[in-house]
Amino acid sequence: MITVVGGTFSKLHKGHKALLNTAIDTGNEVVIGLTSDEYVKKNKVYPAIPYSVRYRTLYNYMIKRTNKFRIRQIDDRNGNAPYEKDYEVIVVSPETYPRSLKINEIRISNGLPPLKIIRVPYVLAQDLFPISSTRIINGEIDTNGKRITPLKVGISTRNEAKIQAVEKFVRRLVKNYQIVKNENYNLKTQQPFGEETMELATQRAMEALKDNDYSVGIESGIIYESFSKKYYDVHYCVVIDRFGNVTRGMSSGFEIPDHIVDRMKRDRTFSEAYSGYLNVQEIDQSEGIIGKISEGKLRRIDLIEESIRNAFILRLDPDFYDSTYTPP
């Protein structure tokens, strides 16, 4: 039985090793299709690392783990996988999974049995983008996925609590980062209700993306819950990355009394309505109304952080959510 895996392997990184180790773990002889220099020159955006160098690095990695392997030069993405009758298993990444389906279509049309496909999950760098040779060659990350250049995160806000919450989350991911504040935006309302909350959070994120790695849009709004017939205050977060992937998350919500809702419907924000009710001039941005209500046991910044975290949950396990990245 033979397991096949293919690639360019320009910079042998954690993602490549996951593919190779999975192939070895099948217990079969492993055939590695290594793309030729000509293929790399035609199809990759980075300078070609010579075949001989890539071959030697790949060989040295494999020989320490198994002697049941061969490395074959291939000149296209499919190699000889569509035609080899002895191949039984193919190991692929999420990016190359569609190609394996095409390979099986060709095999079937050639009267050969389809290959068993083993799809290896994404291997993410610190910044939650997949590790790739392109990123390593560009000096953005190292072969283990550690971020080298600053992770740039844009946010459209004039609220320091939102900036602090974003920075706190990003700091958990990487040590090298830059928060880029965008204050040049205009919203159609200062107090969104219902789906306006989601729309304005999306607008904030879109206007902050620019040339950043991520952009974050956070909006607090009022949503109506039909079962209890009550209104709730929530924070909604939209995250857009440089590849165009969009993820969303929401904080837990707390009920707003009807008399405050009535004040808000007279063209007031939640903060203005609550301040008027208490006869106070201003509410601290970090503490928020929830801080006043709970006597400091909860703060608005906690709810903001919760919405950010929940928007990034999908990025922590993109395979579970069937997400597809399309990095260069």
From Swiss-Prot:
Catalytic activity: (R)-4'-phosphopantetheine + ATP + H(+) = 3'-dephospho-CoA + diphosphate; XTP + H2O = XDP + phosphate + H(+); ITP + H2O = IDP + phosphate + H(+)
Entry keywords, A to Z: ATP-binding, Coenzyme A biosynthesis, Cytoplasm, Hydrolase, Magnesium, Manganese, Metal-binding, Multifunctional enzyme, Nucleotide metabolism, Nucleotide-binding, Nucleotidyltransferase, Transferase
Pathway listed: Cofactor biosynthesis; coenzyme A biosynthesis
Localization: Cytoplasm
Principal subcellular localisation of the protein: cytoplasm
GO biological process: coenzyme A biosynthetic process; nucleotide metabolic process; thiamine metabolic process
Domain of life: Archaea
Pfam families: CTP_transf_like, NTPase_I-T
InterPro entries: Cyt_trans-like, ITPase-like_fam, Non_canon_purine_NTPase, NTPase/PRRC1, PPAT_arch, Rossmann-like_a/b/a_fold, YjjX_NTPase
SS bond list: none
Cofactor: Mg(2+); Mn(2+)
GO CC annotations on file: cytoplasm
Co-factor note (free text): Binds 1 divalent metal cation per subunit; can use either Mg(2+) or Mn(2+).
A single MF term (Gene Ontology): ITPase activity
Phosphopantetheine adenylyltransferase as annotated region, ranges: 1-152
EC annotation from Swiss-Prot or TrEMBL: 2.7.7.3, 3.6.1.73
Region (Inosine/xanthosine triphosphatase): 153-328
Function summary: Reversibly transfers an adenylyl group from ATP to 4'-phosphopantetheine, yielding dephospho-CoA (dPCoA) and pyrophosphate. Phosphatase that hydrolyzes non-canonical purine nucleotides such as XTP and ITP to their respective diphosphate derivatives. Probably excludes non-canonical purines from DNA/RNA precursor pool, thus preventing their incorporation into DNA/RNA and avoiding chromosomal lesions.
Family label: In the N-terminal section; belongs to the eukaryotic CoaD family.
Protein name: Bifunctional phosphopantetheine adenylyltransferase/NTP phosphatase
Organism: Thermoplasma acidophilum (strain ATCC 25905 / DSM 1728 / JCM 9062 / NBRC 15155 / AMRC-C165)
This protein's encoding gene: coaD
